[in-house]
Design a protein with these regions (language model features):
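Active-site-adjacent bridging/hinge elements
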Residues: 168-174, 290-303, 358-363
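Noncatalytic, helix-rich "gating/capping" subdomain that lines the substrate-entry/channel surface
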Residues: 1-192, 196
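Secondary-structure capping and boundary motifs in well-ordered enzyme cores
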Residues: 157-165, 169, 186-197, 215, ...
């Protein structure tokens, strides 16, 4: 095969079997991964080392620039029997929890190195298919796009090119977008919309008949602390240290990935940057982030048909207003409600109120 394997089909089967084992014995199902009580496990460096099961974890951490890190959050550690009882997990839920990180390190140590190398090769080809020769991109789309998702054909090449550029230089593209499509008056109008919907939600919380005054006070404090971010962040990244070479998209992609990783590692041990966004200005979407208690509305969703500066109020409330209410609601849904006004994972509900909430949610 093109990757240099004499028996490409045979090696492909071994890689398939490796990934099948990951899916069956390591991975957690998506519903279980939503449970923040299960996926937030703070460990010391020494405790992380205990998960290695012979895997050269310390070498990997050093290579990643994490050798001096003294605290880690590991998202897929199966709960102990005591922790499972504390969380009230039933047998059906426990059955959906895979072996996680400990199982993965054990699997790697028990897998022949040539299979791991082939798997890594497959991952590299798959992740870079869009910028490799057309036959790789076509094969990747035929499987992931058509076979798995039923999409009959690729997007036009120019759209894929924009997506690739956004993946590497997203905020620089965003800077051009907001200069052209997001005037200052749009932000001012959105601030008013958010303020009015915040008042409406406060009235709704106040009228809840099953919630105690103590929990309502916490809920109101959280609502008052919502940090609305509108349009774009003030200091969009310009990537001054990222070298881009014309005619070499693979090298550019690798350089961008390295830049992104180093940028992330540089933030370790630093105060949380509350100006940072997790979406680009040109993304037609919005989100609520429980760890910062923020609601974020990129510039691209603040366009017709969701929002128009000259549109009737009814149109804007029916469009972007519904989106604002939706994102605010995430602050009080089954997972968002586990964080307090500061974004800390803290139970601010009385036991009776939490039970009533869960009962209504499961009705």
């Amino acid at each position: 095969g093109e990757a240099g394997y004499a028996d490409a089909a045979g090696m492909a089967q071994k890689v398939y079997d490796f990934e099948d084992t990951i899916a069956r014995t390591v991975s957690w199902d998506r519903a279980t991964r939503r449970n923040r009580d299960l996926t937030y496990t703070a460990l010391t460096h020494a405790q992380v080392d205990e998960l290695a099961n012979g895997f050269p974890l310390e070498t990997m951490l050093q290579k990643m620039g994490l050798g001096q890190t003294d605290r880690f959050i590991v998202s897929d550690i199966p709960p102990s029997a005591e922790r499972a009882a504390e969380l009230g997990l039933d047998e059906a839920t426990l059955a959906k929890i895979g072996g996680g990180t400990p199982a993965m390190t054990t699997l790697i140590m028990n897998t022949p190195v040539e299979v791991l190398q082939a798997w890594t090769t497959k991952e590299m080809l798959e992740n870079n298919a869009a910028i490799l020769p057309k036959r790789f991109d076509d094969a990747d789309f035929a499987f992931y796009g058509t076979l798995l998702q039923g999409t009959p054909e690729q997007r036009p090449r120019w759209k894929r090119s924009i997506a690739a550029t956004e993946g590497m230089l997203g905020e620089l593209v965003g800077k051009s977008y907001v200069e052209r499509y997001f005037p200052a008056e749009n932000k001012a109008a959105m601030i008013d919309l958010v303020s009015n919907l915040r008042k409406a939600l406060a009235e709704s919380i106040d009228e809840i008949d099953w919630m105690s005054d103590a929990t309502k006070r916490e809920a109101m404090a959280k609502l008052d602390s919502f940090d609305p971010k509108i349009g774009y962040r003030d200091n969009l990244e310009t990537y001054p240290d990222l070298a881009i070479t014309a005619g070499n998209p693979v090298a550019n992609s690798m350089a961008a990935a390295e830049w992104g990783w180093q940028d992330m590692v540089s933030k370790l041990g630093q105060p949380i940057d509350r100006t940072e966004w997790f979406m680009l200005p040109q993304t037609v979407n919005a989100y609520y982030n429980s760890t910062k208690n923020e609601i974020v509305f990129p510039a691209a969703i603040l366009q017709q048909p969701f929002f128009g500066i000259s549109a009737d109020d009814a149109v804007n409330y029916g469009g972007i207003g519904a989106v604002i209410g939706h994102e605010m609601g995430h602050g009080f849904d089954d997972q968002g409600s586990k964080s307090d006004a500061t974004g800390m994972l803290r139970n601010w509900w009385t036991d009776a109120d939490r039970q009533a909430f869960d009962k209504l949610g499961n009705a």
